[in-house]
Amino acid sequence: SIPLFALAWSSLAVSAPIKPQKISEAMVYTLPGKTYEQVREDLTAAIEERGMVISAVSHVKDMIDRTSTDLGYKQGIYATGGETVLFCKADLSQAMMRDNVHNIALCPYGISVYTLAAEPNKVFVSYRIPPKLKVYQPIHRLLDDIVQSVAE
């Protein structure tokens, strides 16, 4: 006979963390089985649930679409989204800037959500990672934690 608590635990779905790819200076995650709208909504919730405030949303896709033909490009890059959500966490930002006042350029943090024109059914989430800054490691962990919660 299997104990009741074992049955309860076995019915819980535990998802493994998704693994990002490091592409250039960005960590890029592919979130299968989710729509852009779901991911964008979940990202907002994940940031706010951690007590942070979104300071701005950069509409990168709109700028790319608006300027493509003027620059000689025939096709856009992004199918939907193409937004970067900007926010900070006071304690981590304080530590980063007290380590080096010029780290102000690394704040706010940004997480981008988008689908590609070439792959409209895949939702991507990405963020920048500065090269080898020890003081940025807690921020990197925070950003990964946020994306992992969005992926669940």
Question: What do these predicted regions represent?
Answer:
Residues L43, S58, K89-D91, A117, ...:
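A mature extracytoplasmic/lumenal domain signature
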Residues F124-E152:
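C-terminal partner/receptor-binding element of secreted or periplasmic proteins
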Residues S1-I2:
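Bacterial N-terminal signal peptides that target proteins for export
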Residues L106-K132:
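Beta-strand/loop substructures that line and gate deep hydrophobic ligand-binding cavities in soluble
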Residues S55-L106:
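Compact, glycine-rich, soluble single-domain proteins
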Residues S15-G51, A56-S58, D65:
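Terminal, regulation- and interaction-focused segments at domain boundaries
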Residues A8-S10, S15:
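N-terminal signal peptide c-region/cleavage motif recognized by signal peptidases
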